[in-house]
């Protein structure tokens, strides 16, 4: 079997918002890589046996900070690529000079490649459109480095060591705004580091199945199946590896999208023949949420009750030794809790660090090394439906945070119908995959309406659709008025409890994507 970790690249993180993008681009060219804090122990770096090292960008100023690349990075004899801050500290640590730029540079820029033979710019044209994001610049390269690219505002836009395979770029090749960024990453990983492109879905599936079998043996495994992307792919890979040793518990909270519970059972229990226990807990959730209007309180109640019900069902399964979870690599990175990290943790993750202290089951995380886009590709490779894998994100508490205030059965049913119409029309008009997330929100206020000759006094549905790359910021989707008119007419005519439909035109910031 191919060892997919045999050729790998180590990424040292200086706190850049783009560090995970670097890792994703390296993996896209077929090379495994991992991210670690810049101040990780020297012995770890040495024992990692990387074929190459990438130094990320960062928010600090090189000449104001004592944050530097570990000297061992430059002593191992492996290629090094410094990006933005990574380039600046590498040059400075080799006798160069960095100063604050007269003018910060954020956005697209044109760089001119001065030397491209057998370096990171191989096979690229002289003029390249790139993405800059820096306030400092290299003013003197020192005796060891030479300039291999320049731009109007950054005369030292890229450097190469005169005798060692060390390279630096002031711009960000990992972003999609740098038109040939992937080629630059590929040149470094494959041509300079001499990595073989072993990291692909076929090899990952083969490797994961072998590792799961080795880890689990003949033990039984329990998985909480939600119908979301991560747990669905975990179910598929575990079933492929250990068959009927897997038991999935699907807690139907009643707060899912219209008919979603039936769809989950159809895909996994009927189509894939996976052992799934469906727990109809709709009434328990409604009872627990009665009279509760505070969003945070609703989240806590839903989360705790979900765990309680899961535990009740798990206790009934004899000889279970493992609990499988859909933890993915971005969860691991963002929940690492590294005190030296300059990157801000945007949110806590339900998949990491939330396990009961008294849990006696061992933890199995087959997706722990994968980013979300890799998880989706893995799911396709395992035969899961495209529409299941590429659905818009859905919050853990479900419709519980899309119904403002108290949750009632009538409100849930109303929102499910309205939301389903919105989604159906997005698919019908080929708009669904052009936007990042779209859903309905139930507003517990009534509005006067007229249908035919009848006066109606019913509820309001807000439609929300956004476009985003990373969901940390988002713009509202500029959907055609004709389309919105069709959706609005259908909802008001087909959902009797709704008399008015509004469209949310708030970006993030200042708003959040979800209303609660």
From Swiss-Prot:
* EC number annotated for this UniProt entry: 6.3.5.2
CC per GO annotation: cytosol
Alphabetized UniProt keyword annotations? ATP-binding, Glutamine amidotransferase, GMP biosynthesis, Ligase, Nucleotide-binding, Purine biosynthesis
Ranges for domain GMPS ATP-PPase: 199-391
State the top-level EC class.
Answer: ligase
Sample GO molecular function, one term:
GMP synthase activity
Q: Which residues bind ATP?
A: 226-232
Which InterPro entries does the protein's record reference? Class_I_gatase-like, GATASE, GMP_synth_C, GMP_synth_GATase, GMP_synthase, GMPS_ATP_PPase_dom, NAD/GMP_synthase, Rossmann-like_a/b/a_fold
Residue span(s) of domain Glutamine amidotransferase type-1: 8-198
User: What is catalyzed by this enzyme?
Assistant: XMP + L-glutamine + ATP + H2O = GMP + L-glutamate + AMP + diphosphate + 2 H(+)
Pathway listed for it? Answer: Purine metabolism; GMP biosynthesis; GMP from XMP (L-Gln route): step 1/1
Statement: the UniProt record of this protein carries the keyword GTP-binding? no
The family database entries (Pfam families) matched by this protein are listed as: GATase, GMP_synt_C, NAD_synthase
Q: Where is the active site?
A: 84, 172, 174
Which NCBIfam families does the UniProt entry name for this protein? guaA_Cterm, guaA_Nterm, PRK00074.1
| Known function | Catalyzes the synthesis of GMP from XMP.
Task: Tell me the subunit arrangement.
Answer: Homodimer.
**Name by which UniProt lists this protein:** GMP synthase [glutamine-hydrolyzing]
């Amino acid at each position: 079997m191919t060892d997919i970790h045999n050729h790998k690249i180590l990424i040292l993180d200086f706190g850049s918002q783009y560090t995970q993008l670097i890792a994703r681009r390296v993996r896209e060219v077929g090379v495994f890589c991992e991210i670690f804090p810049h101040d990780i122990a020297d012995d770890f770096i040495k024992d990692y046996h990387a074929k190459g090292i990438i130094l990320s960008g960062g928010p600090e100023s090189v000449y104001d900070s004592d944050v530097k690349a570990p000297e061992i990075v430059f002593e191992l004899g492996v290629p090094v690529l410094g990006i933005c801050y990574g380039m600046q500290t590498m040059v400075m640590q080799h006798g160069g000079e960095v100063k604050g730029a007269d003018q910060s540079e954020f956005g697209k820029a044109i760089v001119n490649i001065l030397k491209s033979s057998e370096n990171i710019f191989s096979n690229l044209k002289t003029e390249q459109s790139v993405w800059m994001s820096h306030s400092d610049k290299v003013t003197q390269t020192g005796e060891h480095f030479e300039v291999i690219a320049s731009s109007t505002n950054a005369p030292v836009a890229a450097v190469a060591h005169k005798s060692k395979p060390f390279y630096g770029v002031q711009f960000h090749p990992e972003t999609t705004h740098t038109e040939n960024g992937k080629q630059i990453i590929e040149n470094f990983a494959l041509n300079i580091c001499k990595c073989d492109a072993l990291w692909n879905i076929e090899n990952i599936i083969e490797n994961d199945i072998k590792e799961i079998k080795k880890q689990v043996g003949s033990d039984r495994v329990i998985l909480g199946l939600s119908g979301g992307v991560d747990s669905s792919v975990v179910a598929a890979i575990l079933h492929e590896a250990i068959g009927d040793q897997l038991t999935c518990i699907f807690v139907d909270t009643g707060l899912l999208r219209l008919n979603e519970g039936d769809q989950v059972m159809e895909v996994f229990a009927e189509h894939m023949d996976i052992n799934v226990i469906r727990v109809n807990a709709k009434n328990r959730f409604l009872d627990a949420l009665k009279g509760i209007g505070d969003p945070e309180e609703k989240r806590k109640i839903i989360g705790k009750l979900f765990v309680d019900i899961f535990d009740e069902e798990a206790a009934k399964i004899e000889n279970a030794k493992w609990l499988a979870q859909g933890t993915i690599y971005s969860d691991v990175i963002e929940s690492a809790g590294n005190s030296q990290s300059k990157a801000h943790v945007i949110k806590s993750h339900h998949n990491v660090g939330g396990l009961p202290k008294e849990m006696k089951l061992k933890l199995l995380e087959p997706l722990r090394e994968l980013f979300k886009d890799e998880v989706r590709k893995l799911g396709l490779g395992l035969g899961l439906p495209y529409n299941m894998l590429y659905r818009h994100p859905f919050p853990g508490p479900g419709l519980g945070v899309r119904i403002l205030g108290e949750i009632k059965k009538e409100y849930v049913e109303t929102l499910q119908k309205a939301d389903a119409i919105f989604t159906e029309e997005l698919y019908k008009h080929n708009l669904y995959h052009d936007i990042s997330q779209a859903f309905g929100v139930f507003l517990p206020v009534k509005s006067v309406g007229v249908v035919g000759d009848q006066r109606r006094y019913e509820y309001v549905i807000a439609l929300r659709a956004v476009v985003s790359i990373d969901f940390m910021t988002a713009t509202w989707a500029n959907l055609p008025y004709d389309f919105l008119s069709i959706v609005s007419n259908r909802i008001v005519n087909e959902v009797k409890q709704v008399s008015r439909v509004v469209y949310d035109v708030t970006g993030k910031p200042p708003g959040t994507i979800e209303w609660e």
